[in-house]
Amino acid sequence: MATAETFYDVIRRQGITRRSFTKFCSLTAASLGFGPGAATAMAEALETKERVPVIWMHGLECTCCSESFIRSAHPLVKDVVLSMISLDYDDTIMAAAGHQAESILAETKEKYKGKYILAVEGNPPLNEGGMFCIDGGKPFVEKLKWMAEDAMAIIAWGACASWGCVQAAKPNPTQATPIDKVILDKPIIKVPGCPPIAEVMTGVVTFITTFGKLPELDRQGRPKMFYSQRIHDKCYRRPHFDAGQFVEEWDDEGARKGYCLYKMGCKGPTTYNACSTVRWNGGVSFPIQSGHGCIGCSEDGFWDNGSFYDRLTNIHQFGIEANADKVGMTAAGVVGGAIAAHAAVTAVKRLTTKREKADA
């Protein structure tokens, strides 16, 4: 029986040198935020471990997650799809169709029982027996449950699979339901966003492929490596928030100076994602940098939380945790107090010096 190829076997067959492979591991480890030692571990894993089979299924969705995924720059999606993993099924991009495509699902399920990753883009509608989404002549929810039975783990791509997204907006006539409410007995990695950042998606796949385990997840099931901080925490406009400098109207002086967009509805203070660090389009920019506030697309229920331009209320603390209307006055008061304190200390020092000279 032939041994399955590893990632290293594939790239060597493609003519890629050992030096280029090592460089790839170093760059990928750095892009994932790992230390220098991780590059060696990554190289060893990719040299010895078989490529992980991946089944990519689509429910109710717009395919924006796939559109984002194919634009990954670090690592390049071609390296992920053609070398790092074995993408055995994806009905959006595969050449096979009809019964031929369906037979691939059954073959992979049987051959790689307990070893394949089930990546799900979109969600199943449960109303009317799941008849609002038909795949291969069957309700998508049935197909999802069938493939989940023998999966090693499930990746829920995007806000649709993670939370429900716009198709679950009230009154949700199709009863569109997130994956974790349907599959209850498998580990599920939620990678929310509408869509998720490309490098976040490939980063999750790279981590599983390299280390043979799931990344550490937060209490909502999201990878901590990408969803542990609020966008607001690392936003380059954060100093303007702390200084009480806000855009009050589109195209006002504050907007032209790049002031904080909080009053224009920016959801950065309550949204956990890597937009302000990883950014989009190969690290070029992200919505706030382009002049538009965050809409909170990686948070549960963002589609039913009112207008994207409705301002968040009762944001507490200096920085994020104080009311924005009072931040400017507070900052001015703190600065004024500091100046007064400095003047008082200086006066005391001068008086003490004069007394010491007089006593001498």
UniProtKB/Swiss-Prot annotation:
Explain how, and how many, cofactor molecules are bound: Binds 2 [4Fe-4S] clusters.
**From which residue to which does the signal peptide run?**
1-46
Q: Which domain of life is it from?
A: Bacteria
Per its record, the protein catalyses:
H2 + A = AH2
Could you give a single Gene Ontology term from the biological process aspect? anaerobic respiration
Where on this chain does [4Fe-4S] cluster 2 bind?
Answer: 232, 235, 260, 266
**UniProt-annotated binding residues for [3Fe-4S] cluster:** 275, 294, 297
Main subcellular localization, coarse class? Answer: membrane
Q: What does the entry's PTM section describe?
A: Predicted to be exported by the Tat system. The position of the signal peptide cleavage has not been experimentally proven.
Q: What is its cofactor?
A: [4Fe-4S] cluster; [3Fe-4S] cluster
Show the NCBIfam families listed in the entry: hydA
What name has this protein been given in UniProt?
Uptake hydrogenase small subunit
State which gene encodes it. Answer: hupA
